[in-house]
Swiss-Prot record:
Pfam family, one: LpxD
A GO molecular-function annotation: N-acyltransferase activity
SUBUNIT field: Homotrimer.
This protein's name: UDP-3-O-acylglucosamine N-acyltransferase
Job of this protein: Catalyzes the N-acylation of UDP-3-O-acylglucosamine using 3-hydroxyacyl-ACP as the acyl donor. Is involved in the biosynthesis of lipid A, a phosphorylated glycolipid that anchors the lipopolysaccharide to the outer membrane of the cell.
Reactions it catalyzes: a UDP-3-O-[(3R)-3-hydroxyacyl]-alpha-D-glucosamine + a (3R)-hydroxyacyl-[ACP] = a UDP-2-N,3-O-bis[(3R)-3-hydroxyacyl]-alpha-D-glucosamine + holo-[ACP] + H(+)
A GO CC term attached to the entry: membrane
Domain of life: Bacteria
NCBIfam families xref list: lipid_A_lpxD (TIGR01853), PRK00892.1 (NF002060)
Keyword Glycoprotein found: no
């Protein structure tokens, strides 16, 4: 289905520079778009691609359109039509969602014959329950929820209206998932937190005893508009709930330990690990494979770059990095050798300073 720029602006705002009746039926990158497609410029370093693109129209910020100059709407090469908006990237995302919705017919409400639903569960008539879904006693499935094949919903758990669980996602007992959640395949919500009490006597080979499992009797509370990536795990709390606040976006294969609280609008990239009882503020960004120790607090607007390790609280907004960027292997070996000898070098410097001070050559 193609829409005119005028129709897009009526839905999403912005201003048209060019032909308001130009029709676009999809989106594509600047260097691949054709005359019936809409492209976008989110980074001014790609401005040269705007000049050569074959796109029918381009989403662009006002300052970037100005950079194109007076010829932007009069040249024979490149686009002549623009939707001018302060945030082309977000505009692109909304248009993309619209095109997907238009191209994807809604699934008919109902329960697949192979699904297993406890009589004590409550499932809205507008819900879509796929093959081999299991819903235990006391669970509540609200309006418009879609549970794909093999989804498991534990006893007493609530799934908020309009949520979508992809195949093989699981949410254990006693959890609350807010409206419009998106939970991707293989994600697990509410598994036991990693809680074990040491009960050992003696040392070395004479040591006896074991680890005693601590029952995890809390749950998981997830706010509205949260997205959880494939194979991500969110552990239930030991006593109080683990909490994921509204509009948090979590990538694939992320581990969130028990009793964590993740603040609203925070994003967490793939393979990050967050140990138990850690609080992350609002609007934070956690890079891929970052590791955050337990019982620490990150303030609002904290950014942790990829592969960084956080071992203490960071209350102040800012960008924090501890990862070592990749370098040539030989250079790395030289640096590693220097690091191993830092203590010896420090002692030599102290000795030299002391000798110079004794000779009156410098202040120690």
């Amino acid at each position: 289905m193609a829409l005119t720029l005028e129709e897009l602006v009526k839905r999403f705002g912005g201003e048209i520079a060019g032909d308001a009746q130009c029709k676009v039926g999809g989106l594509a990158p600047l260097d691949q778009a054709g005359p019936q497609q809409l492209a976008f410029l989110a980074n001014p370093k790609y401005l040269s691609q705007v000049e050569s693109t074959r796109a029918g129209a381009v989403l662009i910020a006002p300052k970037d359109l100005e950079k194109l100059g007076a010829a932007a709407q009069g040249r024979t090469a490149g686009p002549r039509n623009f939707i001018v908006t302060p945030n082309p990237y977000a505009y692109f995302a909304r248009v993309a969602q619209m095109f997907i919705d238009l191209a994807t017919p809604p699934r008919a409400a109902g329960v697949h014959p192979s699904a297993t639903i406890d009589p004590a569960a409550k499932v809205a008539a507008t819900a879509v329950i796929g093959p081999h879904v299991t819903i235990e006693a006391g669970a509540v499935i609200e309006d418009g929820v879609q549970l794909d094949a093999n989804v498991f919903v534990g006893r007493g758990t609530t799934i908020g209206a309009g949520s979508h669980f992809y195949p093989n996602a699981s949410v254990y007992h006693g959890c609350k998932v807010g409206p419009r959640a998106i939970v991707h395949a293989g994600a697990v919500i509410g598994s036991d937190g990693f809680g074990f009490a040491p009960d050992f006597v003696g040392d070395g080979d004479a040591r006896t005893g074991s680890w005693v499992k601590i029952p995890q009797v809390g749950g998981v509370t997830i706010g509205p508009d949260v997205e959880i990536g494939a194979n991500t795990t969110i552990d239930r709390g030991a006593m109080a709930d683990t909490v994921i606040e509204e509009c948090v976006k979590i990538d694939n294969q992320v581990q969130i330990g028990h009793n964590c609280r993740i603040g609203a609008y925070t994003v967490i990239a793939g393979s990050a690990g967050i140990a138990g009882s850690t609080t992350i503020g609002r609007h934070c960004m956690i890079g891929g494979a970052a590791g955050i120790a337990g019982h620490v607090t990150l303030g609002d607007y904290v950014i942790i770059t990829a592969k960084s390790g956080v071992s203490k609280s960071l209350p102040k907004a800012g960008i924090y990095t501890s990862a070592f960027p990749a370098v040539d292997h030989g250079e790395w070996n030289k640096s590693a050798a220097l690091v191993r000898n830092l203590d010896k070098l420090r002692e030599r410097i102290k000795a030299l300073e002391a000798a110079l001070a004794a000779q009156g050559g410098t202040d120690a």
